[in-house]
Amino acid sequence: MMTDITACTLDCPDCCSLLVSVDPSGDIHIRGNPEHPFTAGFTCAKIRHFGKRLKNPLRKVHPMVRVRGRWEPIGWNHALDLCAEHIQRLRNNPLSMLHIQGEGAKGVLKQAGRYFFSQLGTSCVRGSLCDAAGYVATVMDFGSRENNDITDLLNAGYIIIWGRDVLRCSIHTAAIVGQARQNGASVLSISPGDDANSRFADRAITIRPGTDRFLAAAVIRLFLERNVTAPDIGQYAHRWNEFVRFIFSRSMESLIAACDVSQEDIDTIYRYYSDTKPAATLIGTGLQRYRHGGENVRFIDALAFISGHVGRSGGGIYYHLHSLRNLNFAWSRSAKTLSGRILRFPCIGQDIIDAADPPIRMMWVNGSNVINQAPDSHLIGRAFETVQFKVVVDAFMTDTASRADLFLPSTLMLEQEDIVSSYLHNYIQHAKAVVSPPGEARTDFWIFSQVGKRLEPPVILPDAETFFRCALSTDRLSISFEDLKKQNFIKVKRPSVAYAGMKFDHSDGKFRLPARLHSQEPVPDKFRLRLITPVSRDHIHSQILVDNHRLPLIVQVSSGCPYLADIDLSKDLYLVSPLQKLKVKLELSDRLHPEAAVLRRGSWMMTGGGVNQLIAARITDIGCGAAYYEQYVRIEN
């Protein structure tokens, strides 16, 4: 049984190197590559069972067109001609076409869709359903977005896991944290609770959801009160004196009350950051999914900065990096790019409906189950109905694909060649195609290339190898595409310590401190529980096989929740927002804040799930991110 080396292209930070083999019965076996320094021979359950996704009988592997409300088969040539006809008809009015691309898969060739539609000058989306507020916050603070090398965590004396479920988010980060703890590091977990960090943490602090900025500000105030900031810290910061006055304008009592912790909790966090041993901070994306999510991240950044743990080995701030930062994407900007219209991803339903002069008449969706994954799913569904022609490229009949007019079957990971990089570590990897695609499934790159040739004038995409060679042409790499295929992966040359010597990437070299601390908005009278929809251990976003859906959905609340007194737990239960309600099963936890309700995301509307039906579309303070966790709900019979 031959074994091939390839790489994971799912939307996961670990970007594992994989060993893949197919036995005589056709079963696909996947394991982590022991020769890869980061993957180190193990991978997560999502990957180990991925072969079942490839061979699932409900996978759609032939093009289909909707005719009088019913799906009918269509040949590829006819399907591509149909796409080209609709694009050609609207080409003189390109803003009437909308391209939506998500992060269903990573890789160089996955950028071909953005390249293709940018040449047409169509409408597109901006913002993010993931990490935009936190990403922009870190750039505002540091002048760029860099982390210490992830393995530098092994040099930490203290590790603060702030709003990140390391085991569910990144199994390799969890392993590194576990090893650091064995080496003597002390680990503190801060969150609204119900994460898997208890097995790593020496201490856990449970806070009111969305109030991380007040907690960080309280600890900063304690540093300033005791005058124990890092030596000469003021000379490394822009407007330091103004920041000090600003912090002292807020009382310690008000800050503590806002985040619902004790003075003892503040003292504990202070001890972790005030010691001379380096303290590393791992920031999760959940805490930036609030209206003031960017502000949450900025105050945590400020705490790490003023305590002297930035720019040193064993310290630093760890947040999502850009998955394309180690590759050259000049090819995507080399041709003339026309000016298009931009719609907001987090509010895509309302923005489609509001689009005028011209309205959206054609839509192309790839790499995204947008109706399921973006807020206010029903509104997005209604917006889709206003669009005359909708193309969805996918492998399954998802909540989004089921509303298309033309369905084009895509290849999946292991069936398509690409080059992929990580938003956690610094390895570039060749993702070899190691399994033949079923039926008539085709790559996104092939589809765009074929449609482009049918246009007049044509939109010609260079061949895949040209894109690969260009992507590898960067000062941080010295490897050819041929050599990368031979050795499978290479580590990019980057400093192991970010911002060493407190040298930041703003023009004056100084760190930027937050200047405002917004109060929390009042809690709605009839909806008192803050809805949190974190990741699952078993699947990426909504990439769940239909037979793996479990109903009713499980919602977790605190065993001390004060809002269950009038609920009959023996009867049917519903999670309710002003938009919609879902039937749920209640699970009580003693590790969750009393004002939080946790329902893990990804379930499909068509199977009775779909938590984003409950969540109104809101924008974060910076970055045009989706403020999912600003939604309040209640539980009722």
Protein language model regions, located:
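A glycine-rich, hydrophobic/aromatic-adjacent loop/helix-cap motif
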Residues: Y273-A356, P495, M502
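Acidic/polar loop patches that form or flank catalytic/metal-binding clefts of enzymes
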Residues: I28, A230-P231, I266, A280-T281, ...
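Conserved short loop/turn motifs at secondary-structure junctions
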Residues: L98-K106, A258-V261, G284-R291, S368-V370
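N-terminal export/assembly segments and adjacent metallocofactor-ligating motifs
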Residues: M1-R226, S262-Q263, M362, P562, ...
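Generic, well-ordered alpha-helical scaffold segments in large soluble proteins
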Residues: L82, H86, Y115-Q119, A180-N183, ...
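A cross-kingdom feature strongest in bacterial/archaeal respiratory oxidoreductases
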Residues: D4-C8, N155-I161, D165-F200, R208, ...
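N-terminal leader/propeptide and maturation segments of large enzyme subunits in energy/redox metabolism
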Residues: G69, V228-S262, V435-P495, K571-P578
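Flexible glycine/proline-enriched surface loops and loop-helix/loop-strand junctions
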Residues: F200-A201, R250-E253, L282-L287, I428-S436
